[in-house]
Amino acid sequence: MTVNSQRHSVLLDNVYSLIDKKVDAQQKSLVQQFGRLLYKNISNDDLENRNDSDLYGATLSLWSGLAKFKSTAPYIRVFNPEIEKHGWHSSHTIVEIIVNDMPFLVDSVRMSLNRLNITAHLFLHSPIAIKRNDKAQVTAFAEPGKTLEGTRKETVIFIEVDRQTSKSDIETLTKELHSVVDEVSLAVADWQDMTGKLQTVIKDTAKFNWPVSAAHKKQTKTFLEWLSDHNFTMMGYRYYEVKAIEGDHRWIPANDTSLGLLKNSINDRERLLSKLPASAREEALSDHPLILTKTNSRSRVHRPAYMDYVGVKVFNKDGNVVGEHRFLGLYSASFYNMSVTQLPILKEKVQEICALSGFEPGTHAFKAFENIVETYPRDELLQTPADELAQIVMGIFQMQERGISRLFIRKDVFGRFFSCMVFVPRERYNTQLRKETQALLKASLGAKEEVEFTTFFSESVYARTHYIARVKDNNAEYDVKEIEKNIIE
């Protein structure tokens, strides 16, 4: 044991001694056990420059919160501890959260701090098996790795964040945390119902009258089955009825079917298809059984990506769209890590665009073309029509290793963004060029916010950066060659 480790061990022992001296005899053993569970994973670095009295105060403060916690509502407290008022001090603002244990909680809380540009200087969290009596008082803790009859897991979170000096800042953070915990609770509470709904949809596909070939129906059903096999994190579900009216269509939400996060928009109103761009109207009423796209908003649960939207269309016997089962969530890591040749729907699309290339299978050209597809952004592979994707991939292939710069732009069919793929020689790529390209795309395409980017390096001589320019309407006119010229210059 190092000198620092010994000192930190003594520091925590002093905390437990203070509990022994100051806490009521009937509770002190429980409070000591709670402290050991709370600090069992704290690092030596996190204990540096701390004193036993403040750690004791933090422990007692959380213990008090644990006593107040009722399983029906989360306990969330944000405050600046003061010696005179709380008996202990911290130079940071303290966040205490106690909730029933659930998935995604810690990631979602971290995301909420990041959205507010608040840094966490200490983040302790632990699911603890707690036994309470009929008055909700804590009576026992199960030791890690051991079971104790009558316990329920509760997650205790203690965070030290940048000091929030104003009352409004503290209120904003508190409100944000309540909102996030509520969203996590909604998604987790309805998870089983949402996965059950997907299973029902899979069983009922024969009733949906999809006006496509038997092979296409099989591919679609296989994809939905793959999603249900833990490859899609469910966040929300709702059914929409589609009614044709004179010269238009209405998407009518069946709000009583809402599950998960879509319960937050329970009063969602019906929408006219005519309000959408022409490409979106065409997609919504097309023969394609599925709508695969992204939502307009980032997930506040699990990871901060734009949520994935899987719409399963229902047709009548005349081949007209009459309904949609809408699932919102996030594709799991397997979607991004598995080979495209193993992913339902994508593997068929890859086969189609490789066939469109005209290259003979097994040739060097075919393998090079196939490799471009394999390493292409997965979301783009899924959302881009096969014929358009084949043209883009052929354009990339034709660049070969010539050291030129190229820009490829795809319009989102729902009119919400431009997807821009920029290839530049690796030796040219740097942060300054990336920032200049972001500014150029924002101005040229009329983006309403900062252009997002993801850069990919491979063995190629090129650096590939995928930019997303979010707009109110992507029908704006633009000149790809002119933008490309400005990037080169």
Model region roles, listed by residue range:
Residues M1-S90, I94-E96, M111, S126, ...:
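Charge-rich interaction surfaces and accessory domains that mediate macromolecular binding and assembly
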Residues F69-T72, L116-T119, F397-G403, K442-E449:
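Short secondary-structure junctions
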Residues P74, A120-S126, S405, K448-F456:
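Short beta-strand elements
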Residues I97-V99, C420-Y429:
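A short interface-forming secondary-structure element
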Residues M102, V106-D107, M111-E143:
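Well-ordered mid-protein domain cores that form the structural environment of catalytic cofactors
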Residues V109-R110, N114, L433-G446, I487:
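Short, non-transmembrane amphipathic alpha-helical segments
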Residues H125-K135, V451-R464:
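Short connector loops at secondary-structure junctions
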Residues K131-R163, H466-Y467:
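Extended charged low-complexity segments that act as oligomerization/scaffolding linkers
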